Amino acid sequence: MEDINALSFGTFLLLSFFGAWWHWNKMRREGRVAGTFKDYLLADHPANSMATGAMLLAATWAAATSGTADLVNPQLIVTMLMAGKLHVASFNAIGSAFIIGYGFDSIINKGGNQ
């Protein structure tokens, strides 16, 4: 089995959950859901939220084992920024993590109770 960097895994997963949060925030602004993000995840439709979480974990695992998650490692990002550069691959990985979270939440978690 390939070694997985826990910091890279956690950062990619956090960025994915940020995408899911962004989707909830968009639905809240449109009036499609009410309440907090916690209510949206746990109270309204917990089975959908569990499915979304499972998909985010699976996508993060795939990103970590393929090496994509290593591109969002905060230590790497800080080192590159201190050198005055940031690789396009890191931008792509950050965007991918965000889109994975937003997309899976959009597909699976259709909305909460109003």
What does each model-found stretch correspond to?
Residues M1-Q114:
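Cationic, hydrophobic amphipathic alpha-helical membrane-interacting segments
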